[in-house]
Amino acid sequence: MIRSSCTMGLAETLRPAKKVPTVWWSSPNPMSLNPNRSTMVILIVGEFIFGLGDSLLIAAGVGNTPWTVLAEGIALTAEVWTIGEATFLVSIAVMFLWIPIKETPGIGTILNIIIIALTIHVMVPILPQTENFLVSILMASSGIQLVGIGSTMYLTANLGPGPRDGWMTGLQRATGVPIGRVRITIEVSVLVIGIVLGGTF
């Protein structure tokens, strides 16, 4: 009986969530302009952790996310921007794509644009570049974990999605296409454009 209860509890824990869970720090109103201090702290720390994780992935040199490939491609093409600055510009551009689908940004959306790009801009130049494959794998693994932790923190704050997530969910709502197909279409398109511009993955 105890084993059965433990097994069911584990299964519930590992079951994919259909929506972002509500926790004690979640804002009851995603459009709030005056959220609780604890909510803001967790939001900001989460977005910093996300940016740090993305920075580790970039520094590891063993593979980037599609959006980072695009930012790197833009930075290499322009030759005047860092990846962090290009990430900021991409986020702003994606925000304009919210207009036709009538998405509304929250405080978390705006801070996402600023904090993640700033963290990448500051951290990538100071993180070690290594030719040791095992160290690179360790850095990449740590980066993936930090991105997951950071995402969980800022999404559960419920103060607005990041520009990319908001565009994805907005397109799904506007078109009725399953979210998985929307995500794959967006990320493959972004990846191809990034590669054409010279980004690496």
Name the predicted role of every residue range.
Residues 2-201:
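Core subunits and conserved enzymes of cellular information-processing
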